[in-house]
Amino acid sequence: MDDLPTHLDFLLSEESNPKGRGDTCRYLAAGARRALWMRARGGSLGQALPGLLEALEGDEHAIIESSSIMAFLQPAVSLLVIGESERELKASARQFLARADAFVTVRPDLKPLTWPATSLQTLEGKPVFLVSPDEWSNPALCQFVRDQLTAAEVR
């Protein structure tokens, strides 16, 4: 990780600028109460997890943008976001593909067959939500997330 000081294996910081260009800035601009950024070197995410969980303590819901975190947590809802130019999934996304509840894409031609080593059986029956690059949301996606969170509260 180029942005992580060499003497650290992980670092948790809180974003405060909703007008910035990073993902955490966009979360704030979209209305998030707060946005945290956990950076961890390969293999250090498990060490970083206690600090992240402590930082999230008391929060009813949290959005965690990470496939790798799925090795440690079972989310109430898991969305796999496929960007415009992604022709191949990252290894961490492929590893937890079966645990995705739905897919979100800006590409109307989303074709899982273009993803090497991806089983179509893993994807069958899972909803795909098309969003615009300006909005990254739509009413059906919002309703899906609400329904998943409600179902998780019942369990």
Spans of features found by a protein language model:
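Short secondary-structure boundary/capping elements
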Residues: S16-K19, S44, H61, E88
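Conserved active-site and cofactor/substrate-binding residues in soluble primary-metabolism enzymes
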Residues: G22, S44-Q47, W136
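Flexible, active-site-adjacent loop/turn segments at secondary-structure boundaries
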Residues: C25, G43, S67, A71
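Active-site rim loops that border cofactor/substrate pockets in soluble metabolic enzymes
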Residues: R33-G58
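Conserved catalytic-core segment of NTP-binding enzymes
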Residues: G51-H61, S66-L149
